[in-house]
Amino acid sequence: MINALIINYPWFMYLVVGLFSLAVGSLLNVIIYRLPIILQEEWKEQCCELFHFEQRKEKIKLNLFLPRSFCPHCKAMVKAWQNIPLLAILVLRGRCYQCDSPFSIRYPFVETLTTVLSLYASWHFGFTIQLLFALLAIWILISLVFIDLDHQLLPDSLTLGLLWIGLIANTQNVFVSLDVAVLSCAGAYLALWLFINLFYLMTCKVCMGHGDFKLFAAFGAWLGWMYLPIILLISSITGAIIGLIYLKINGKSRDTAIPFGPFLCISGLIAMFWGDSIINWYIGYWM
């Protein structure tokens, strides 16, 4: 029945993906905002226990689902209908109903980006098992991009989750065979680990965090070793160019830390969608 629906009414399937991804985009906004706060609270608790500090009296009681979404300015609870993606932004003209403070433009941007990438993935992969896993990867990568931009943090719950989902997908050879996925995952982590440690020995500077290792390893688990050079090359070039422009415009020193995770995420998506075309172009151009 589902196959008949896909064949006879593809527009309906795109509509389902579009509406569902809008809702997912709204959830991603919650994850992007709350997950770093939750992690920071956990780390503070662990520090208090480890060093026998007095327990903190004021604790932020927050998880990914409770309390309900609220205005970051006046803390007014968002009404149920105001959680409908994009609709509330349009009806309320992008402002809180209680204090009239403007919402961040990021909220509709994340929802729109999630929808556009999900629809493109549907067109690119078709309505197959590849699409199901690709959508999971896209949603996790969007979360990682904005969390890293805000906090220079790539949470293990997301990077390692992405890694394991990739390995699970490839137990069925969705993108590559399982043996290639496992070896590529281990090789990707080891390669970056060796490079960063050699760089530190020569310069006494840390140029990349361990979260980047895990994210790069996750791409190995998903796509195999063949795409890793593409991901590393594109992310390094774009990161260097955009980083230099950012430092120049803002008058920052060269020692200013710039998150590398967003460039890895974007490069990973490029490899997922157009990796074969890039490899074929390279072979045709040089061979």
Curated annotation (Swiss-Prot):
Plays an essential role in type IV pili and type II pseudopili formation by proteolytically removing the leader sequence from substrate proteins and subsequently monomethylating the alpha-amino group of the newly exposed N-terminal phenylalanine. The keyword Hydrolase applies. Keywords: Cell inner membrane, Cell membrane, Hydrolase, Membrane, Metal-binding, Methyltransferase, Multifunctional enzyme, Protease, S-adenosyl-L-methionine, Transferase, Transmembrane, Transmembrane helix, Zinc. Its cofactor is Zn(2+). This is Prepilin leader peptidase/N-methyltransferase. The lineage of its organism: Bacteria, Pseudomonadati, Pseudomonadota, Gammaproteobacteria, Legionellales. It holds the Pfam family Peptidase_A24. Zinc is required for the N-terminal methylation of the mature pilin, but not for signal peptide cleavage. GO terms for molecular function: aspartic-type endopeptidase activity; metal ion binding; methyltransferase activity. It is found in: Cell inner membrane. The gene is pilD. One of its GO terms (cellular component) is plasma membrane. GO terms for biological process: methylation; signal peptide processing. It is a multi-pass membrane protein. Zn(2+) binds at C71, C74, C96, C99. It comes from Legionella pneumophila. Its EC number is 3.4.23.43, 2.1.1.-. The chain crosses the membrane at residues 12-32, 127-147, 158-178, 182-202, 215-235, 259-279.
